[in-house]
């Protein structure tokens, strides 16, 4: 999986703190609001985005009421994400404004509305992976990277 951009420093639970692990950040939990580490922990992440751990820093762990006691300092990036798009937009290297396509097949939901991307995101098409069908139409499955505005 490709990753681009600057690494973000954050904290994750000790059990998740391994390179290659991906997670979706859903927003701060109640205990985070009064935590002195919230700025570096949840303050650097955007709710609803997918992150991939690149590196675990060799620093001491910190106590946390949410993560079974301990969190570790890690470097994360937003990874590339696979999404189905209109074939006319599928040009490798191009930047498009993401417009989700409707698909009634619940098993393909993750391809048509993947977690980590939002309608209207500006994304760069990294690679065209193939075709995917839904509702009698053929779409292109592409790997994209979100472009931060």
UniProtKB/Swiss-Prot annotation:
InterPro entries: UPF0179. It comes from Thermococcus onnurineus (strain NA1). This is UPF0179 protein TON_1048. It comes from the Archaea. Belongs to the UPF0179 family.
